[in-house]
Amino acid sequence: MITHLKNWPRLLNRFVLQLKNARHSIHQFTHLAGRLQRPPKSGKSSRDPYLVTAVQGRSKKPRYPGERANQRFGEDSWFVSSTPLAEVMGVADGVGGWRDVGVDAGRFAKELMTCCSGQTQRSGFDGRSARNLLIAGFQELTHREQPVVGSSTACLATMHRRDCILYTANLGDSGFLVVRNGRVLHRSVEQTHDFNTPYQLTVPPADRQDCYYCDKPEMAVSTRHSLLPGDLVLLATDGLFDNMPESMLLKILNGLKERGERDLLQGASQVVEKARELSLNATFQSPFAIKARQHNVPYSGGGKPDDITLILASVEVPRA
């Protein structure tokens, strides 16, 4: 994500010395990692549907130490959580403009996902409102004794097992797809203030409580969709959607012969690898290049190098 921050002069002065002393590597480094999420073996009805989930991602720049363990791909973050009542997953994309003032742009996204994941383990959480989960997670983050300064988009999805209904909340330009029988059944809609300036949750510095883009979690678009066994649910940051057309994404997903854990991981890996390849292609007419032209924004064309995070899940039912 490339978003310009405005009206932060005091913050800029505070961190300018850090920026002068920082050493930046100019070579490009990408990292691929995957994770399989198995259904819980206890705490739920043996007849309830569940999600088999794979996570893949690439960071476009050198990783921070311990990034993989911290569930980060560059400035993106994610989480997957299972409870007796629901399956939950989320992605967040830290606003890159904070790098210009010496702030780790990915930390805010990581801490937001950590708070949302923690909220799923609280009593009373039933997975029927992804937006309420986002609200609760953001409130927890903003009430920390030591503020985590930054901004990020967020996309959360919860599947209530008994109802087999997917509840989503999307704020910004990350998003989700529901695929059934080879076709996109539902797709999220971007929320943007302007071209390449998505809605974003923000915690400003203590001395700058007025902020330029301080959107509220209540502004997230909330949807619900009935799911069937075999449906695919995909969550991703804009590093995927800005570089890969929907038709190309479907071609890869429709090539999955099975929906087992390793099959999903292989499919997710293929999607991420292809998106990364397209992001580095200077002549490919990417979705990002097309949007730039539609907004009369000068852009030479090609993909948009960015962090990519993808969660791919399949709806399954226990075998008798």
UniProtKB/Swiss-Prot annotation:
Mn(2+) 2 binds at D93, D238. Its cofactor is Mg(2+); Mn(2+). Keywords: Hydrolase, Magnesium, Manganese, Metal-binding, Protein phosphatase. It catalyses: O-phospho-L-seryl-[protein] + H2O = L-seryl-[protein] + phosphate; O-phospho-L-threonyl-[protein] + H2O = L-threonyl-[protein] + phosphate. Its EC number is 3.1.3.16. Mn(2+) 1 binds at D93, G94. GO terms for biological process: dephosphorylation. Gene3D superfamilies: PPM-type phosphatase domain (3.60.40.10). Pfam families: PP2C_2. The keyword Magnesium applies. Belongs to the PP2C family. This is Protein phosphatase PTC7 homolog fig.
